[in-house]
Regions:
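Extracytoplasmic/secreted proteins, especially bacterial periplasmic and envelope-associated proteins
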Residues: 40, 44, 48, 111, ...
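Electrostatic cytochrome c docking/interface patches
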Residues: 24-47, 58-69, 77, 205, ...
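Hydrophobic, aromatic-enriched interface-forming segments
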Residues: 125-141
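Post-cleavage N-terminal segment of exported redox proteins
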Residues: 1-36, 203-207
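Gly/Gly-Pro-rich "capping" loops immediately C-terminal to redox-active cysteine motifs
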Residues: 35-36, 42, 61-127, 144-175
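Surface-exposed patches in mature extracellular/periplasmic domains of secreted proteins
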Residues: 142-147, 209-212
Length: 216
């Protein structure tokens, strides 16, 4: 039953954004680091996700107690990563209901459990897509939320991590992104945060897969 649900969920992620994916098809994907055996990186990815992404996006197929597979104790998970649940066995869902999110945003933001698998294509892995996407936001005054993205043009999602990265602008002549206002992190530090976050999203799609691979 769970496998059928996950299959339907994956298909929804694959086909719902087809137009947007086509719009960004010509953009080169940067290679994401493979961090599936790096528990410290995945722990940091969980921290970034909970603090910056989980106001809108959940990982509903992952229960909080699965985070102990990353080397965290249950107490560490409860103290530092559980802000929308009461029990360690609860799914990692957002606190707001889908109907409320639809009212606020026009559509409920998608659950991200399987996003890394759904974004895989002939152009690169889902991790590559996410790693590029989360580093490709730029200021665009023409957009309702003030942001745009070179990989996913006219995306409705704002840049949730802009305080860390800073503000990028798109050069009208070269179509390259350049830093206009520095953020809290250097470029290298921000890239590392995103790599860790993407690593966590890859792990969420199949918890434990990377560790099993390392064990042979």
């Amino acid at each position: 039953m769970k496998a059928d649900i996950m299959k339907k969920f994956l298909l929804a992620l694959l086909f719902a954004p087809a137009i947007a994916l086509g719009a960004g098809a010509a953009v080169h994907l940067d290679k994401a680091p493979d961090l599936q055996g790096d528990k410290a990186a995945l722990q940091n990815g969980a921290r970034v996700f909970v603090n910056y992404c989980m106001n809108c996006h959940g990982l509903s197929f992952v229960r909080y107690n699965r985070l102990t597979e990353l080397g965290l104790s249950e107490q560490q998970v409860m103290d530092n990563l559980m802000f929308t649940a009461d029990k360690i066995g609860d799914p990692m869902r957002v606190a707001a209901r889908a109907a409320e999110q639809k009212q606020w945003f026009g559509a409920a933001p998608p659950d991200l459990t399987l996003v890394a698998r759904a974004r895989a294509s002939a152009d690169g892995s889902g991790a590559d897509w996410l790693y590029t996407y989360l580093r490709s936001f730029y200021r665009d005054e023409k957009r309702p939320n003030g942001w745009n993205n070179t990989l996913f043009p006219n995306v409705a999602m704002p840049h949730a991590l802009w305080e860390l990265q800073g503000e990028l602008v798109l050069d009208a002549e070269t179509h390259a992104l350049k830093l206009a206002t520095p953020g809290q992190l250097s470029v290298a530090e921000y890239d590392k945060e995103i790599a860790d976050l993407v690593g966590l999203l890859v792990w969420a799609g199949e918890p434990g897969a990377g560790f099993r691979k390392n064990l042979g």
